[in-house]
Design a protein with these regions (language model features):
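Inter-helical turn/loop segments and adjacent helix faces that build the functional surface
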Residues: 124-125, 145-151, 222-225
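Histidine-centered divalent-metal-coordination microenvironment in nucleic-acid enzymes
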Residues: 128-144
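Acidic, His- and aromatic-enriched active-site or binding-groove loops in soluble protein domains
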Residues: 151-172
């Protein structure tokens, strides 16, 4: 009896668990990070699209198209040109403990890869390229239920409220003396916090951890009214009012919104009259705000980032605002500041979304619903395009949907990696044996040449027979069959002789 492929029951390992099949349709809340860099070629700032045309002209290997003019890097991040800057973006990373550090690691891994490709471009074109840090964007999912958004809990009101809450702590962790503001943008299904690029991976991870902890906590407040700040004792500078963001909808805590420039003032001077009636320093305001949200920050933070946040807030570690000027590392990102494997995989494994996207970019096939599917592209941030190998039918799956097949995908990838390792070991063993055979043949030839040279000396007419040394001429090696016959045991020879007679 022949059963068609469409009637075959999927293997148990390929079927989604029952709990996953009943999961809510909105998907997991996630974060994502972006960084923008000005491009300096031969000490002149240029538009990258005018010089390179496309990221494909920088990266030497094949790239997976994401959307528009952006392409995925082998690291899982994306690169594209945006209004005169090079922008790097991380994949979606589900919100869980260590998500801020994972996002920072992904961003800096992509930055290191891009820097290596630019180094190769420099050698090919004999020109110099520098990346100057411009800004960093921290994106956090907004997932308030739709029936509650009508109760003044909209993403726009949340962004306005967060501009007041995040200003002081983000300034202390991420800004420098040449910064101009901290912004918050409502982006539909997410909140985007914008700040200057931080040329220190540890400080960036600490900033991401603080932002995601505060945003997720404020998102759960019953009201997004500014009166909540006074009720919870969160200090705000008197008279502070954010301005509208210049590029998109949103608000910015710009230096002109304060009585003095907070980016150039002494962070330890109690010079700010606050809504609580006290005069506090910038560090004190940031510390009190951080303590108010410490439970949420601690829940989502990794140990290293939590220690650094506490150290900066208490003054045990310096803020970039305390330096006399902006660090030189801003002017050559990827060289003067690098990723030094701050969060190794053994301590902080990849997130599930990272693993899904990594398999898709690598083109590793996965078995779903009884058929093999091969990824052929990516749509936007959250969808992968597959082609069913049996009939070529295309199928678009979200990252959340692919979580149900991630374990089977991992097993397939691990099995193929193991097979490749075994094949590599076999190839190396074959190469070793071939090299040993070549050396043995070469040594035999050298011995034969030396013997022939000695024979030539014996036959030299200038030497007499009495003076010539006695040298036995080498006998020709018997054929392999004869040599094998001679080396065979007597019992085998006698047995073979009886059969031949």
């Amino acid at each position: 009896m022949i059963i068609g492929n469409e009637l075959k029951r999927p293997r148990r390992s390929d079927r989604a668990p029952r709990a996953v099949r009943r999961a809510r349709p909105h998907g997991l809340p996630a974060i994502g990070m972006e960084a923008e860099f000005a491009t300096i070629i031969d000490d002149v700032q240029v538009r990258p699209e005018d010089v390179f045309g496309s990221p494909r002209h920088i990266v030497r290997g094949p790239m997976v198209h994401r959307t528009g003019r952006s392409y995925h890097l082998p690291t899982g991040g994306a690169v594209y040109f945006d209004t005169g800057v090079i922008e790097l973006a991380t994949p979606m990373i589900e919100i869980a403990r260590g998500c801020g550090a994972r996002g920072t690691r992904s961003l800096w891994e992509s930055l290191g890869f891009l820097r290596e490709e630019l180094d190769a471009w420099e050698q090919r074109h004999t020109r110099s390229v520098r990346l100057v840090g411009f800004s960093t964007h921290y994106n956090v999912s907004f997932d308030v239920p739709a029936d509650e958004s009508t109760n003044d809990r909209s993403v726009e009101r949340l962004a306005f409220l967060l501009t007041h809450v995040l200003a002081a702590p983000v300034m202390l962790l991420a800004a420098n003396r040449r910064s101009t503001g901290v912004g918050v943008r409502p982006r539909g299904d997410r909140i985007e916090v914008t700040a200057d690029f931080t040329p220190d991976a540890a400080l960036m991870a600490a900033t991401a951890t603080l932002i995601v902890g505060i945003v997720r906590d404020v998102m759960a407040w019953p009201s997004y009214d500014l009166a909540e700040l006074a009720r919870r004792g969160i200090p705000i500078v008197q008279g502070f009012s954010p301005v509208v963001h210049s590029s998109r909808q949103g608000w910015v805590a710009r230096h002109a919104c304060f009585p003095a420039n907070p980016f150039t003032c002494d962070v330890n001077a109690p010079m700010w009259a606050t809504s609580t009636g006290q005069r506090l320093s910038l560090r004190q305001m940031a510390g009190r705000t951080t303590r108010e949200f410490w439970r949420s920050i601690r829940t989502l933070g990794d140990p290293l980032s939590l220690q650094l946040i506490a150290a900066v807030m208490r003054g045990r570690a310096p803020s970039l605002l305390e330096l006399p000027n902006r660090p030189d590392a801003y002017d050559d990102v990827g060289r003067l500041c690098r990723w030094d494997d701050l969060f190794p995989l053994t301590l902080l494994p990849r997130s599930r979304f990272e693993r899904v996207l990594g398999h898709a970019i690598a083109g590793r096939r996965v078995r779903m619903d009884g058929s093999w599917h091969r990824p052929i592209g990516v749509r936007g941030w959250s969808h992968v395009v597959f082609r069913r190998e049996r009939d070529g039918v295309r199928r678009v799956m979200s990252l959340d949907e692919m979580l149900a097949h991630l374990d089977a995908w991992d097993r397939t990838a691990d099995r193929r990696m193991s097979e490749r390792r075994i094949a590599a070991l076999a190839r190396r063993e074959i190469e070793r044996r071939m090299l040993a055979d070549r050396r043995a043949r070469q040594e035999a030839l050298d011995q034969q040449r030396r013997a022939m040279d000695q024979v030539g000396e014996v036959l030299d007419p200038s030497t007499t027979a009495s003076d010539a040394p006695k040298v036995d001429a080498p006998s020709a090696a018997p054929p392999p069959v004869v040599r094998a016959w001679e080396d065979a045991p007597d019992s085998v020879v006698q047995h073979s002789s009886r059969h031949t007679h």
